[in-house]
């Protein structure tokens, strides 16, 4: 079953490079959600690892009679959390020329590791420092939440508007993953990847 949605292609430089006007979104299935400190098997089609802001959204969103506005968003956010995403395809790609290439094959090998969920409590996600690292590989990549389609909440708003437009509905609370704050980081070595987002905390994935 579908348990959430992911915004993809949220980096402004990527949007400009591919001459796209907006990101895309894709469904996320329950079997692809893993608890913090979980294990992920990778294969030759794995592209890399990402660090992003995730939200748990109240199912009452689906009962909105009017178009959702930015003022409505805080009312339906149940939790916020750091998330590691492992990105992959079902088959080998020779490069990305459009979001069609990405979205047509998204979701095959993707896993999402969810960090500790917190209440929103007026946490401003517009400009938070982020870092993902693997000590064993001596690898560390820094980022910022402001690289995600202006900011993660704006990316969330984009996904919610698309869901309303497509008239998707179901009876459960759901996740929205807003896009990478560090780009796609190559997995140099198996072992523990730890992601940290200021104010949100730490998320850990064991790659094997």
Functional labels for PLM-detected ranges:
Residues 1-151, 156-157, 189-192, 200-208:
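Catalytic-core "active-site belt" of small-molecule-metabolizing enzymes
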Residues 66, 161-166:
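A short beta-strand-loop-beta hairpin characteristic of the jelly-roll/cupin
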Residues 90, 168-172, 176:
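A short, charged
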Residues 154-161, 174-177:
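Short, structured beta-strand/loop micro-motifs enriched in basic residues and often containing a Trp
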Residues 170, 187-188:
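Short, well-ordered loop/turn sites that connect or cap secondary structure elements
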Residues 181-185, 199-202:
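Short, charged beta-turn/beta-strand-edge "cap" motif at the junction between a beta-strand
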